[in-house]
């Protein structure tokens, strides 16, 4: 019987020198102490303790794959972006789907999922950094507080008290809370969930006309979700359930696909609609701004190296291309800086030179040097203006002017539009009886051992949304329906600026 042999790969140090012995450390005699001149041992240990890079503050654990984006409908009347220049056009992309608050724990544990896409367009990388929910919170000033509330406390364990204390003090969170506590709260896999850009972005066309836009990505596999009990069983057996499902589906040739839709609002409509169109706690009614199918994408190639491509992938809403822009959405405005800056901390200032993040088009930035620099600047002049015609700006790609007004101040966004209950009420009333009961039961399970005054505070928000929401939640939590208003007298939050 003959045995096929793989080609021998000789072990070397990082400088290319051969490793003579990878079994025994260099010592003074058989039983003597180690010698500091054991170069391979020194290098091996030094590299080992630096293998782990800083964890993402959110979306720490995820899966990723490369894929193909294909345009299915002409939207050039809305945008000049070349990725949408013609029907049938294909663009290479990378997607990372992730848990949000669960650190690097089990995939089936936390509820919200991250949905980040990177498109390698001929005009630069375009990133859509969203979630599997269409809404979030209105101001990034509270994002660090959210992070601390939903993750480990100072005592090193997650706390239902911290989580729900924070949520219940922010009535604007009820829309998101209603979604994540619903029967769609825990996706069965990354393949079986929708994705949303969530924010309001802008498009502009060759004529300089601006439109406001929301991006939607609907799973062609359909929606599948887990109950709390089903998720608990999966967690006990397989902490990588979502990662395994996505990877193995692609390996089998069952490429997951999503259809991309947009909602388009003419620029002037933003001042006319009866809600704040840039408020991330709100959705746009589809009867007013229907979904328009634009494209589809599939994830069809697994990374060869998980760390190189998935862990080092870096997404930022500031990665925009001509024809696609931002909006006055406060959360988006702050993320334009914060996300890229988080990648500089996590991966270094030259994170865009890592292959998975590198644009496929030529890059002619005169930013130079810094830790991890891997490309050369061959031009003699690294400054602008200069006498050699280098680094010339491109005014033809300027975004149309945006009219703004108002005095600079710490404006209370609640004074602009404090209706945080109409939309969760509409969502609640779309649910059938079984879905409403799942919402009540999931909320009760998630609130756990949180103090009663926090539970009552949340129930008051539910009552303000819909009496049936409050009554069902009260019953699931074992609270007396008549008590929520009376409990205000013992709620310590009443002294915190009238938040309730």
UniProtKB/Swiss-Prot annotation:
GO terms for cellular component: cytoplasm. Keywords: Heme, Hydrogen peroxide, Iron, Metal-binding, Oxidoreductase, Peroxidase. Its cofactor is heme. It comes from the Bacteria. Its EC number is 1.11.1.6. GO terms for molecular function: catalase activity; heme binding; metal ion binding. Decomposes hydrogen peroxide into water and oxygen; serves to protect cells from the toxic effects of hydrogen peroxide. Belongs to the catalase family. This is Catalase. It comes from Neisseria gonorrhoeae.
């Amino acid at each position: 019987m003959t045995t096929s042999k793989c080609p021998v790969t000789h072990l070397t140090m990082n400088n290319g020198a051969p490793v003579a012995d990878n079994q025994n450390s260099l010592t003074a005699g058989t039983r003597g102490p180690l010698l500091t001149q054991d170069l391979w041992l020194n290098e091996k240990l030094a590299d080992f303790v630096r293998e782990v890079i800083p964890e993402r503050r959110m979306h720490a654990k995820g899966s990723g794959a490369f894929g193909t984006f294909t345009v299915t409908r002409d939207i050039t009347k809305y945008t000049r972006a070349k990725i949408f220049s013609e029907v049938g056009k294909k663009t290479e992309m990378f997607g990372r789907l992730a848990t949000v608050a669960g650190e690097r724990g089990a995939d089936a544990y936390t509820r919200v999922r991250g949905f980040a896409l990177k498109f390698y367009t001929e005009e630069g990388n375009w990133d859509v950094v969203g979630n599997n929910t269409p809404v979030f919170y209105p101001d990034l000033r509270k994002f660090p507080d959210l992070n601390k509330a939903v993750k480990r406390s100072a005592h090193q364990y997650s706390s239902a008290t911290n989580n729900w204390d924070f949520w219940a003090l922010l009535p604007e969170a009820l829309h998101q809370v209603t979604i994540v506590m619903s029967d769609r709260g825990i996706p069965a896999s990354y393949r079986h969930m929708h994705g949303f850009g969530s924010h309001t972005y802008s498009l502009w066309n060759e004529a300089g006309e601006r439109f406001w836009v929301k991006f939607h990505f609907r799973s062609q596999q359909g929606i599948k979700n887990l109950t709390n009990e089903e998720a608990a069983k999966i967690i006990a057996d397989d902490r990588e359930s979502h990662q395994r499902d996505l990877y193995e589906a692609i390996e089998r040739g069952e490429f997951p696909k999503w259809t991309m839709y947009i909602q388009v609002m003419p620029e002037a409509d933003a001042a006319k609609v009866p809600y704040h169109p840039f408020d991330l706690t709100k959705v746009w009614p589809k009867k007013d701004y229907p979904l328009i199918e634009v494209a589809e994408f599939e994830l069809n190639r697994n990374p060869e190296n998980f760390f190189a491509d998935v862990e080092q992938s870096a997404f930022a809403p500031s990665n925009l291309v001509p024809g696609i822009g931002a909006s006055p959405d406060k959360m988006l405005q702050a993320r334009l800086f914060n996300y890229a800056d988080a990648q500089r901390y996590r991966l270094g200032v030259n994170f865009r030179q890592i292959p998975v993040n590198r644009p496929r088009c030529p890059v002619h930035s005169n930013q130079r040097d810094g830790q991890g620099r891997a490309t050369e600047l061959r031009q003699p002049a690294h400054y602008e203006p200069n006498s050699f015609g280098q680094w010339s700006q491109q005014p033809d790609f300027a975004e149309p002017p945006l009219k703004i007004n108002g005095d600079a101040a710490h404006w209370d966004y609640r004074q602009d539009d404090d209706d945080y209950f109409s939309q969760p009420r509409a969502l609640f009333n779309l649910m059938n009886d079984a879905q409403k009961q799942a919402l009540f039961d999931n909320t009760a399970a998630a609130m756990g051992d949180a103090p009663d005054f926090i539970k009552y505070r949340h129930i008051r928000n539910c009552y303000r949304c819909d009496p049936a929401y409050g009554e069902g939640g009260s019953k699931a939590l074992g609270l007396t329906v008549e008590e929520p208003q009376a409990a205000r007298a013992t709620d310590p939050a009443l002294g915190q600026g009238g938040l309730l």
